[in-house]
UniProtKB/Swiss-Prot annotation:
Signal peptide interval: none
Tissue: Expressed at moderate levels in lung and white adipose tissues and weakly in brain and liver.
Single GO biological process annotation from the record: regulation of signal transduction by p53 class mediator
Family, as annotated: Belongs to the protein kinase superfamily. CMGC Ser/Thr protein kinase family. HIPK subfamily.
Polar residues bias spans: 497-512
Keywords: ATP-binding, Cytoplasm, Kinase, Nucleotide-binding, Phosphoprotein, Serine/threonine-protein kinase, Transferase
Name of the protein: Homeodomain-interacting protein kinase 4
Taxonomy of the source species: Eukaryota, Metazoa, Chordata, Craniata, Vertebrata
Location(s), subcellular: Cytoplasm
Primary localization class, coarse: cytoplasm
Disordered as annotated region, ranges: 487-616
Length: 616
């Protein structure tokens, strides 16, 4: 067993858990504390020295935050010898992508998506206070801490691509964001700010619900095309100012057209670049509103007498889609800020409480958020908003009547305990939560069964009666799953996740917009800074059905290295055993593989550590 030593500590290397393009990650035992840690090991040379310099600078800035309260990974120390660099981090369990893959990419209920979103928004709000743009937010960079002890408690990792806003705003060609989660201002070459992270988070939220990336573009043209087909064309003034607009758009030949720009056709793009556009979406949405109709979300609208639990879940899903729409806007100044998003009814659960407080769904949602924010059984410290953000931006609905300025009661209780009758019983059943409670039957063995389960909504109440469907349905464009189906699984390339050589990122050359003065609104949006635009506020929507598919889609790959030929970067949808759920008991546990908790041992780390190792 090898041993490495810093100036202040000594580490015993237990095993190497992952190797990447620029280094490896090992699980080590820290002698001074007796804790297991993750050690990223890189070669000590001039090239890697330049790469690691930025990450170290950002890690030291973030080190001033409380990593548990700010939901960022704990950085322990950095040291080096003549041959290697060493970065030591706390040991986390697995990232959201690996969690999805373990669970066959089944859709995550809205209440769990809220729990994750709340924590990531808190992290982004803290990073904004330090003027830091994470610039690579995606499921791989959101880590579950310990799913057995703290369900859906997460932390943001990987600051190798992060930037300090004041330093990057005038840089000619910074590298930021992975393609699936890349903001429009980065795609088009427009001024950008920290709201690029908000766009990425909106894409992650949609992906957790869909079980598939919302915009899985094979290249930047496909990425822009997918966004346009769902959200409409960007406003003309954006394209007039965009440095890269001519890559994806052309002038409209019709002088009377409302928009002087039009998206280049697939044939135009093929003729110009010799690259054939691909169709890799699972759902071809004609608007973001259609997100709520996917995976059984539209079942309630087709039932005459849905029960109150189904109504509560449907209302929550609808509220989540409203927040996603505020996050995914073409114009960054119209996009919701992290602090304002923390006041959104979906995150605060205000509407859910007012209309569905007596439901088990609400109580479980509240309990899940509460547990994710507590550390060692203690409530989180108060979050005080800056003057420009208006009122305190974090407050769950249950706190409204008892919370002070910081969102904590005077007695120190984080939530009121005088709960409605039966609530405690519901809380006690948290361990019995299932990721597919409202979507049983997703564990089909065949592709046809999986597609059928996703298309046929669950019968919510046995006494319900179906009524004719209302409203358009999204087009199911990809039949199969990320793990099974007719497409051959391919091995993921080394370092294909988030390499710190920025190989999966892009260049752009723009200045950042000046900060706009706050424009006070009302309700939960009070305090969100906005700017006004002389252009119409409504983004034109594409009409008609989605484009016909000429090529069968390939498995939706994670964004691969941009500096290489895309055809040489295979996808990562690898086969895994059937997924296991935490805490399933009774008859629902029958037929599911056994899960081995680890209350007395180190959590699973392979996925996270391989990712960290692949970063360099």
């Amino acid at each position: 067993m090898a041993t490495i030593q810093s100036e202040t500590d000594c580490y015993d290397i237990i095993e190497v858990l992952g190797k990447g393009t620029f280094g490896e990650v090992a699980k080590g035992w820290r002698r001074s504390t007796g804790e297991m840690v993750a050690i990223k090991i890189l070669k000590n040379d001039a090239y890697r020295s330049r790469i690691i310099k930025n990450e170290l600078k950002l890690l030291r800035c973030v080190r001033g935050l409380d990593p548990d309260e700010a939901h960022v990974i704990r950085f322990l120390e950095f040291f080096h010898d003549a041959l290697k660099f060493y970065l030591v981090f706390e040991l986390l369990e697995q990232n959201l992508f690996e969690f999805q893959k373990e669970n066959n990419f089944a859709p995550l209920p809205a209440r769990h998506i809220r729990t994750v979103t709340l924590q990531v928004l808190r992290a982004l709000a803290r990073l904004k206070e330090l003027a830091i743009i994470h610039a690579d937010l995606k499921p791989e960079n959101i880590m579950l801490v310990d799913q057995t002890r703290c369900p859906f408690r997460v932390k943001v990792i990987d600051f190798g691509s992060a930037s300090i806003f004041s330093e990057v705003r005038y840089v000619k060609e910074p590298y930021i964001q992975s393609r699936f989660y890349r903001a429009p201002e980065i795609l088009l070459g427009l001024p950008f700010c920290e709201k690029v992270d908000v766009w990425s988070l909106g894409c992650v939220m949609a992906e957790l619900h869909l079980g598939w990336p919302l915009y899985p573009g094979n290249n930047e043209y496909d990425q822009v095309r997918y966004i346009c087909e769902t959200q409409g064309l960007p406003k003309p003034h954006l394209l007039h100012a965009a440095r890269k607009a001519h890559h994806f758009f052309k002038r409209n030949p019709h002088p009377d057209a409302t928009n002087p720009w039009q998206l280049k056709s697939s044939a135009d793009y093929l003729a110009e670049t010799k690259v054939r556009p691909l169709e890799r979406r699972k759902y071809m949405l004609k608007s973001l509103d259609q997100i709520e109709t996917v995976n059984g979300g539209g079942a309630v609208s087709r039932l005459s007498f849905p029960d109150r639990e189904a109504l509560a879940e449907h209302a929550d899903l609808k509220s989540m889609v409203e927040l996603i729409k505020r996050m995914l806007t073409w114009e960054s100044h119209e996009r919701i800020s992290p602090s304002a998003a923390l006041r959104h009814p979906f995150v605060s659960m205000q509407q859910l409480r007012s209309a569905h407080e007596a439901t088990r769904y609400y109580q479980l949602s509240l309990r899940g958020c509460r547990l994710s924010l507590q550390v060692d059984g203690k409530p989180p410290p108060p979050v005080i908003a800056s003057a420009e953000d208006g009122p305190p931006y974090y407050r769950l609905a249950e706190e409204e009547e008892t919370a002070g300025l910081g969102g904590v009661t005077g007695s120190g209780s984080f939530f009121r305990e005088d709960k409605a009758p039966g609530m405690q019983r519901a809380i006690d059943q948290l361990d019995d939560l299932s990721l597919q409670e409202a979507r049983r039957g997703l564990w089909s063995d065949t592709r046809a069964d999986m597609v059928s389960d996703m298309l046929v909504p669950l019968k919510v109440a046995s006494t319900s009666h179906r009524v004719p469907d209302s409203g358009p349905e999204p087009i199911l464009a990809f039949y199969g799953s990320r793990l099974t189906g007719r497409h051959k699984a391919r091995k993921a390339p080394a370092g294909s996740k988030s390499d710190s050589n920025f190989s999966n990122l892009i260049r752009l050359s723009q200045a950042s917009p000046e900060d706009a003065g706050p424009c006070r609104g009302s309700g939960w949006e009070e305090g969100e800074g906005r700017t006004t635009s002389t252009e119409p506020s409504v983004i034109p929507q594409r009409e008609g059905d989605g484009p016909g598919i000429k090529d069968r889609p390939m498995d939706a790959e994670r964004p691969g290295p941009e500096l290489f030929d895309p055809s040489s970067c295979p996808g990562e949808w690898l086969s895994e055993p059937e997924w296991t759920l935490e805490g399933i008991r009774g008859s629902r546990a029958q037929g599911l593989p056994a899960h081995h908790p680890h209350p007395h041992g180190p959590p699973r780390t392979t996925s996270f550590l391989q990712h960290v190792g692949g970063h360099h």
